[in-house]
């Protein structure tokens, strides 16, 4: 019992340490007493304060803060304060802005604006260099010619058959996606028989022609009368009411108030009349519409072609398998008529109204073949017209199918044809 009443002695295991010269040697009892009496919390806080101290980025303080710093040193030395402690409470906090989320439309719009500025700068530089080369005479043609055309936009049809700005007629026969270009490269060949010239056309994102590479040389002259570009002419897109003077003549044989049977007259200058007369004298007739003229012969009716070497052709109309099969069946079950005529006015009328939907160059004939369809609703009659290879002034017309309606136009006299009558030519053309 006496042992239990006595004071309990706590014995702590001493930690081995090397003696230092400053503290000297100490006895085991002193070391034991120090280990029991020392507060572990104070030692822990001192170690943590010495080990973990955040590093801050300080900016230059105003003059007032720097002036007040010595006062803090004088007054706060006894309290353990310093100039650094005072400046810690006055630090400036810099906030970094956060990025905002924007929609995809905004991002694409900004990208297009940036790309547009780059394209405009490139075009201006290319235009200046191209103008200098032309003025100095260094831009000459050759067998393999590379042309930079930054400002020209070449529109093409579904098949790419188009008379381009160089004066020749081209037919697109393929395209391929190449590295380093977002748009595919188009391949063209000259439509003239036995002409080996080909060209490659590369376009920019906006659709403009950026590079044209020619291969070979033309073995023929430029076509004398290329067809007008379909993109720039709105004259073949419909009909409208003719002037009253034309309706009073009764040249079309219909009611003058009926807009369906009235051709579209668009040229109103004497210069265009002279140019049209010159074209007719050369055997090349350019008309924006198809109109009716009487025939004096007993052969099957025919119509005229434009007579120009162009390879415009609606691929959707000519190369559609279902349409081609239907035309073959109609051709076998119907009476196909073939007639020949001349370029005179009496060879351009068969009493029906036709709409030209394409033309293409066929093998063995240097002149294109034109394709027409009847404008009447639900009528499947078609025809194609081509020039004779031996006689350019003769036409061969082939009809496919039968008309399921009566004549649309009454045959007028040949003197009422617009480009044969001087009176009508002066009033309407």
UniProtKB/Swiss-Prot annotation:
Residues given in the record as Zn(2+) binding sites: 190, 195, 218, 220, 374, 379, 403, 405
Region (Disordered): 214-279, 292-348, 410-429
Ranges of Low complexity composition bias in the record: 410-422
Localization in the cell: Nucleus
Biological processes per GO annotation: epidermal cell fate specification; seed coat development
GO molecular function: DNA-binding transcription factor activity; metal ion binding; sequence-specific DNA binding
Key words, A-Z: DNA-binding, Metal-binding, Nucleus, Repeat, Transcription, Transcription regulation, Zinc
Induction, as annotated: Not induced by salicylic acid or wounding.
Pfam family name, one: WRKY
GO CC terms of this entry: nucleus
Compositional bias (Polar residues): 254-275, 295-313, 334-345
Function as written in the Swiss-Prot or TrEMBL entry: Transcription factor. Interacts specifically with the W box (5'-(T)TGAC[CT]-3'), a frequently occurring elicitor-responsive cis-acting element. Regulates trichome development, production of mucilage and tannin in seed coats, and maybe root hair development.
PANTHER family found in the cross-reference section: WRKY TRANSCRIPTION FACTOR 44, WRKY TRANSCRIPTION FACTOR PROTEIN 1-RELATED
Family: Belongs to the WRKY group I family.
Protein name (database record): WRKY transcription factor 44
Organism: Arabidopsis thaliana (Mouse-ear cress)
Upper classification of the organism: Eukaryota, Viridiplantae, Streptophyta, Embryophyta, Tracheophyta
């Amino acid at each position: 019992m006496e042992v239990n009443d006595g004071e309990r002695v706590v014995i702590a295991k001493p930690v081995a340490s090397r003696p230092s010269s400053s503290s000297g040697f100490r006895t085991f009892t002193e070391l034991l007493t120090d280990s029991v009496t020392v507060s572990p919390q104070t030692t822990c806080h001192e170690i943590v304060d010495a080990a973990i101290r955040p590093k801050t980025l300080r900016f230059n303080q105003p003059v007032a803060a720097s002036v007040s710093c010595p006062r803090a040193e004088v007054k706060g030395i006894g309290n353990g304060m310093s100039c650094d402690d005072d400046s810690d409470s006055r630090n400036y906090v810099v906030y970094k802005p956060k990025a905002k989320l924007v929609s995809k439309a905004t991002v694409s719009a900004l990208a297009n604006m940036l790309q547009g500025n780059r394209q405009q700068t490139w075009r201006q530089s290319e235009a200046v260099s191209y103008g200098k080369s032309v003025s100095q005479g260094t831009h000459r043609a050759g067998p393999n010619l590379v042309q930079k055309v930054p400002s020209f936009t070449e529109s093409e049809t579904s098949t790419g058959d188009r008379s381009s700005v160089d004066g020749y007629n081209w037919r697109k026969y393929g395209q391929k996606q190449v590295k380093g270009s977002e748009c595919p490269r188009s391949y063209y060949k000259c439509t003239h028989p036995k002409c080996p010239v080909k060209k490659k056309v590369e376009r920019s994102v906006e659709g403009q022609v950026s590079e044209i590479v020619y291969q070979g040389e033309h073995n023929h002259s430029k076509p004398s009368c290329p067809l007008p570009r379909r993109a720039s002419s709105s004259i073949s897109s419909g009909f409208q009411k003719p002037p009253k003077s034309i309706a009073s003549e009764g040249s079309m044989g219909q009611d003058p108030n009926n807009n369906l049977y009235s051709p579209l007259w668009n040229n109103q200058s004497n210069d265009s009349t002279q140019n049209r007369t010159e074209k007719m004298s050369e055997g090349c007739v350019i008309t924006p519409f198809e109109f009716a003229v009487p025939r004096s012969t007993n052969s099957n009716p025919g119509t005229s072609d434009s007579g120009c070497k162009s390879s415009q052709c609606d691929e959707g109309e000519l190369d559609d398998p279902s349409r081609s099969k239907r035309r073959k069946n109609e051709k076998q079950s119907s009476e196909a008529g073939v007639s020949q005529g001349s370029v005179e006015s009496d060879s351009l009328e068969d009493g029906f109204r036709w709409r030209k939907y394409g033309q293409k160059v066929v093998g063995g004939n240097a002149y294109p073949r034109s394709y027409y369809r009847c404008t009447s609703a639900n009528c499947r009659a078609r025809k194609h017209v081509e020039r004779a290879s031996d006689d350019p002034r003769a036409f061969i017309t082939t009809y496919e199918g039968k008309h399921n309606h009566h004549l649309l136009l009454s045959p007028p006299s040949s003197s009422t044809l617009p480009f044969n009558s001087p009176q009508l030519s002066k009033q309407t053309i």
